[in-house]
């Protein structure tokens, strides 16, 4: 059970606030020339706690805390932005900001010159930011602002107003609008907003997958052809949409943190490239030759062989990766069979075909439409089990080119992993019987 966060004293919070103000003051003082005494005195006066807070409470009205923004839709649009906390939709299965929960990070829009106020309200203290303390109407936070209770409450109201929509909700002529039909002749007119908090979260995930230390280590292991406890993700054909030009801060704070970049995943239909496939006529098994020698299957079996040889580091991640590789090889076998079924039915009846009978029944199913004997063998024979056993025998030979694997303590574990995947493979073949 998580212990509740301790409530800070007003003295602690006040010191925390003053440290922030003094840090900003020092940065400005360091830039002054020795003879700029007037500017120095002005800075000292405006950075006294109550003077700075009074100015911040005035300028906070130039900002709004948001989760959904309008400017990315069109930079000249002048309409409402929303701060909408995550709520599960009525219909399950919909992706959106509601899935972020506590991971949601709010954005801020408005006058970029007032962003120091947002940084002030974002100060983290004992697991909460200052805005949270003020929103919860913490007595300690109020007293930390000012000894004058009325003044402190006035400033609090100004600061927590950063989450409210300025004026009445409004769209704009440059905003996009969608007509959503209703039963009958009615419709909803929707004005979509940019989900800035969700986009920022996805951007962080993509950035970690592309440039994070864990992904980098996995890629380096692959280039060295070494096993690794986890894989990495690739996101090909990303497009970059720029918001704000040379001034991304004019769009929003989070947009500025992303340097104005919005990464777009390709939403295109699959571009299937038809592969030429020839009937396997000259060999008794496709596993040893036509299928087993395809580039992808060869790559998978080599990788699996290396994982089986890792007897020293036999942890859960390695076992899961081995099972995943076997499943991928099974998938390749099923895809190979699907490609062969595009051939003219009955190719396995050609006199020159040397393919084993069980593999003929598996790979040339439409032959049963014109060959009654073949149909009966396919319906009643035990060819799914035979094909599964032939697949298992081939895979064992493919990944155990040296005696180290067959004689190692890993043999029992490998047999169990293979048996599990093989059972699923046979079940799929059994479903294809009809």
From Swiss-Prot:
Q: Where is this region: Disordered?
A: 76-97
> Which domain of life, per UniProt?
Bacteria
Describe the disruption phenotype. Mutants lose phage DMS3 infection-dependent inhibition of biofilm formation while there is normal biofilm formation in the absence of phage infection. Decreased production of crRNA in the presence or absence of phage. Disruption of the entire Y.pestis-subtype CRISPR region disrupts crRNA production but does not alter phage resistance (possibly OLNs PA14_33350 to PA14_33310, and the flanking CRISPR loci), indicating this CRISPR is not involved in phage resistance.
Q: Which GO terms describe its biological process?
A: defense response to virus
- Matches recorded under InterPro entries: CRISPR-assoc_prot_Csy1
Tell me which UniProt keywords the record has, alphabetically.
Antiviral defense
Q: Which family does it belong to?
A: Belongs to the CRISPR-associated Csy1 family.
Entry-linked NCBIfam families? cas_Csy1
Tell me how this protein assembles: Interacts directly with Csy2; part of the Csy ribonucleoprotein complex with a probable stoichiometry of Csy1(1),Csy2(1),Csy3(6),Cas6/Csy4(1)-crRNA(1). A Csy3(6),Cas6/Csy4(1)-crRNA(1) subcomplex is also formed.
* Other notes: In this bacteria, Y.pestis-subtype CRISPRs do not confer resistance to phage DMS3 or MP22, but instead are required for DMS3 infection-dependent inhibition of biofilm formation and possibly motility.
Q: What does this protein do?
A: CRISPR (clustered regularly interspaced short palindromic repeat) is an adaptive immune system that provides protection against mobile genetic elements (viruses, transposable elements and conjugative plasmids). CRISPR clusters contain sequences complementary to antecedent mobile elements and target invading nucleic acids. CRISPR clusters are transcribed and processed into CRISPR RNA (crRNA). Cas3 and Cascade participate in CRISPR interference, the third stage of CRISPR immunity (Potential). Involved in crRNA production or stability.
Indicate what this protein is called per its UniProt record.
CRISPR-associated protein Csy1
UniProt source species:
Pseudomonas aeruginosa (strain UCBPP-PA14)
- Tell me the lineage of the source organism: Bacteria, Pseudomonadati, Pseudomonadota, Gammaproteobacteria, Pseudomonadales
């Amino acid at each position: 059970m998580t212990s509740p966060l301790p409530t800070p004293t007003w003295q602690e919070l006040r010191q925390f606030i003053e440290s922030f103000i003094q840090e900003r003051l020092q940065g400005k003082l360091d830039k002054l020339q020795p003879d700029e005494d007037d500017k120095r005195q002005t800075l000292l006066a405006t950075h006294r706690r109550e003077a700075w807070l009074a100015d911040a409470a005035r300028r906070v009205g130039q900002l709004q805390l948001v989760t959904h923004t309008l400017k990315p839709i069109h930079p000249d649009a002048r309409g409402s932005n929303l701060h909408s906390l995550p709520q599960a939709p009525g219909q399950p299965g919909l992706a959106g900001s509601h899935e972020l929960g506590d991971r949601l990070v709010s954005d801020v829009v408005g006058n970029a010159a007032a962003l120091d106020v947002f940084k002030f309200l974002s100060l983290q203290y004992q697991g909460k930011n200052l805005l949270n303390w003020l929103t919860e109407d913490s007595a300690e936070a109020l007293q930390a602002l000012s000894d004058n209770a009325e003044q402190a409450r006035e400033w609090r109201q100004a600061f927590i107003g950063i989450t409210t929509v300025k004026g009445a909700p409004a769209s704009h002529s440059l905003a996009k609008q969608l007509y959503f039909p209703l039963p009958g002749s009615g419709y909803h007119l929707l004005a979509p907003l940019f989900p800035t908090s969700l986009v920022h979260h996805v951007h962080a995930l993509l950035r970690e997958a592309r440039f994070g230390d864990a992904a980098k280590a996995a890629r380096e292991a692959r280039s060295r052809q070494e096993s690794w406890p986890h894989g990495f993700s690739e996101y090909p054909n990303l497009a970059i949409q720029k918001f704000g030009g040379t001034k991304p801060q004019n769009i929003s704070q989070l947009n500025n943190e992303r340097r104005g970049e919005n990464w777009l995943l390709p939403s295109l239909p699959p571009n299937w490239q038809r592969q030429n496939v020839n009937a396997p006529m000259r060999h008794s098994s496709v596993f040893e030759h036509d299928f087993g020698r395809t580039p992808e299957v060869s790559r998978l079996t080599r990788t699996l062989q290396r994982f089986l040889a890792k007897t020293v580091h036999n942890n859960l991640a390695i076992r899961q990766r081995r099972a995943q590789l076997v499943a991928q090889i099974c998938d390749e076998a099923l895809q190979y069979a699907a490609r062969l079924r595009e051939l003219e039915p009955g190719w396995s009846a050609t006199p020159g075909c040397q393919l084993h009978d069980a593999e003929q029944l598996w790979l040339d199913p439409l032959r049963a439409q014109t060959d009654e004997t073949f149909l009966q063998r396919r319906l009643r024979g035990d060819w799914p089990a035979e094909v599964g056993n032939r697949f298992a025998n081939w895979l064992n030979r493919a990944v155990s080119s040296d005696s180290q694997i067959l004689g190692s303590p890993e043999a029992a574990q490998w047999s169990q992993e293979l048996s599990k995947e093989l059972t699923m493979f046979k079940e799929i073949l059994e479903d294809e019987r009809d």
